[in-house]
Every structure is written in structure tokens, then in C-alpha cells.
Amino acid sequence: MAATKLHPALRNAIRAGANLPTEVISATFDVQEGIKLLSAFLLRHEPVCVLTGAGISTDSGIPDYRSPGRPPHRPLQHLEFLGSHERQQRYWARSLYGYPRIRDTMPNVGHQAINELQRRGLVGAIITQNVDGLHQRAGSQHVIDLHGRLDQVKCMNCHSITTRDELQSRLLADNKALLDQFSVVHDEAVRPDGDAVLDEDLYGRFTVAACASCGGVLKPNVVFFGGSLDPEDVKRASTAVSEASALFVVGTSLATWSAFRIVRQAVEEAKPVCVLNSGPTRADGVIPEYLRLCMPIGEVLPAALRQL
């Protein structure tokens, strides 16, 4: 899409305080107008704090949980994983297959646009609900991984952190006899957390690796459902919102409280909010005034960047 750059006079007027609309813009609204409004929002409120969700990574081939047509999924619970060796076998067997898909995924134009906006000083901190590390891979700094990192593994006993690649090598070595028996139920079954649906007969024969330092239970360094966020990450996210001029939400329905409370904080602190998401969000009808762009992220973000 060709996008006309903002006229320098308009850019200066926006930076000087020209009013921006605070209305919901539907998916049927002119995309070019939405691009101009987003460009104006970013200029007017630099630096903005960015909050991202699964929708920013779908163009990289990582599916989300809530898009239309996605099969229903019961997420693994934190206590369920810790309390059952069978659940640990099931998780790590599926992750052994699914993790490389996430590890080898590349950032898309949305990640790259946010990185460039940060490089230009229009974006400050980036808070992400994603565990894929794609913001960092795109070159972004000051990224707060609110739900952890899939490329890390944590011991639940000694709390040491090791790399997921190191564990992958151990799992492959310990389960060499099973590898040729891996049968994926359907190819689209790899999920945002690196989980994959495999033949049920494998799980009971899968060897789970223990912590190399203390023999404790290993868990991916991500927040399972029912688990608690790292208090330091919560504090850093709150500080990032407070220090920013505005909040820019990208690719999330805000269904989880951990994400929605960040928006609530921005509203309580009278920060302008812009939401760019291809579908409805929890903020719809709740936040009284904000810029809502119900438009494709991979189309709108790069086009807005080209206008600046």
C-alpha cells in the first residue's frame, strides 16, 4: 500500500498539541484514514509505551488462541503441571516437537515497524504478552516479557535459568528411540507456546529431563494459566506506562487481566490510548475515549511508519 507522508506543517501541528479524535473506527472505515490517525497519534504522544499480544506474531506464522476458526483449547494449568509427572511428560513430549517451530520463526513487518519506531524515539518501552522473543529478534530494546520467555527453562527448586536449546538437546538424546515414532495429529496443531498435538501413545514412554544442578522439576520460563506474574515484571510494566505519554496496544483482545489492567492504569493516569487489533477487545465499551483501529496490523503499522 502506498502511503503519503504527512505534510511537515501537519506534523509540527500535531506535535504542538493539535487535537486527535477519540472514537472507535470500525473495520469498514477507510484504512488510509486510519493510517493517518495512527501516525498522528504516535507523533503527538511520543514516546508511547507499546503493549503487544499474539496478534502481532500471527503474520510470522505463530497462531493465536482466540482467532475465529481456531479449535478450542484447554490451556495447561500451573498447578496441574507441577503436581503431575504425567502432565510433565505430556508437555515436554509435545514441546520437543513444537518448540523448534517457534524458535525458528522470524519477526514480521509489525515487529520491524515497532523496532524502527523505537529507534526513532516514538516508542519507549515495549510490554509483550508473547513468549516468542520476536521483538528482541527484530532488534527492539527495553522489552518487558510479561508472560516470560519460551527460550528459557527454570528449575522450580533451585530457580536456575538455562536455555531451552540446551534442554532440547538433552530431550533429544534421552528420547532417541521415540523420535521416529512421533506422529503429529494435524500439522496446524503447533500453538503459540510451542505446544503440539501428538499421538497419545507417546506420552507415557517419554523421558523428562530434571535440573542438571539439583535434580529439580524443570518448567518453561513462561506463566502458565493460574500462575503468577513475576512481581518485578509487573512493577517494570507499571513504571513503563507511568513514564510514557500514551499507551499503544497492538494485537491483543485484552482478555487476560494482566493485559487489561495495563490499559486500566493508562486510563486512570489520563494517558491517551490507541488500540490496533483486527477483532474486538475487552476495552470495547469499557474505556470511554480512545482511538480504536480495527484493521490489519501488518498493513497499517508499516504504512503508518512510512508516513513519519
From Swiss-Prot:
**Which cofactor is recorded for it?**
Zn(2+)
Query: Per its record, what are the GO molecular function terms?
Result: histone deacetylase activity, NAD-dependent; NAD+ binding; zinc ion binding
The cross-references to Pfam families, in alphabetical order and at most eight, read:
SIR2 (PF02146)
Q: Which reaction does it catalyse?
A: N(6)-acetyl-L-lysyl-[protein] + NAD(+) + H2O = 2''-O-acetyl-ADP-D-ribose + nicotinamide + L-lysyl-[protein]
- Residues reported to bind Zn(2+): 155, 158, 211, 214
As for subcellular location, the record says: Mitochondrion matrix
What are the boundaries of the signal sequence? none
The protein's UniProt keywords, in alphabetical order, are: Metal-binding, Mitochondrion, NAD, Transferase, Transit peptide, Zinc
Catalytic site positions: 147
Q: Which GO terms describe its cellular component?
A: mitochondrial matrix
How many cofactors are bound and how? Binds 1 zinc ion per subunit.
* PROSITE patterns linked to this entry: SIRTUIN (PS50305)
InterPro entries per record: DHS-like_NAD/FAD-binding_dom, NAD-dep_sirtuin_deacylases, Sirtuin, Sirtuin_cat_small_dom_sf, Sirtuin_class_II, Ssirtuin_cat_dom
Q: Where is the transit peptide?
A: 1-16
User: Where in the numbering of this chain does the Deacetylase sirtuin-type domain appear?
Assistant: 28-308
Which purpose does this protein serve, as stated in its record? NAD-dependent protein deacylase. Catalyzes the NAD-dependent hydrolysis of acyl groups from lysine residues.
Record-given protein name: NAD-dependent protein deacylase SIR4
What is the scientific name of the source organism?
Monosiga brevicollis (Choanoflagellate)
